[in-house]
């Protein structure tokens, strides 16, 4: 019995892929380049690029930075779950 498979049809790679796509969509909806968005978070622009291109999994530390950032916190739920307000449809930022 594989309880992980039975509990959820989603896997970590699938979740990360969806999150990285939403991360890029959020950045683009804010009209920010990778370097400017990365600077806003305090991470190297190459790290952000690696997240967006799926070369590296988005770490918990980066997610925490987003959750605590005054311009991004309102998008955290959407970013991590895909539920809620899509910033591209709202004309982010909020």
Positions of PLM-derived features:
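Short, charged recognition helix plus adjacent turn
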Residues: 3-13, 77-94
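Short amphipathic helical patch at the helix-1/turn junction of helix-turn-helix
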Residues: 17, 28-29, 57
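Residues within the helices of the helix-turn-helix
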Residues: 24, 35, 64
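Short alpha-helical DNA-recognition segment
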Residues: 29-50
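The DNA-recognition helices of helix-turn-helix-type DNA-binding domains
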Residues: 44, 55, 70, 83
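Alpha-helical DNA-recognition elements
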Residues: 50, 54, 65
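Short, solvent-exposed alpha-helical "recognition" segments
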Residues: 55-61
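DNA major-groove recognition helix of helix-turn-helix/homeodomain DNA-binding modules
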Residues: 61-78
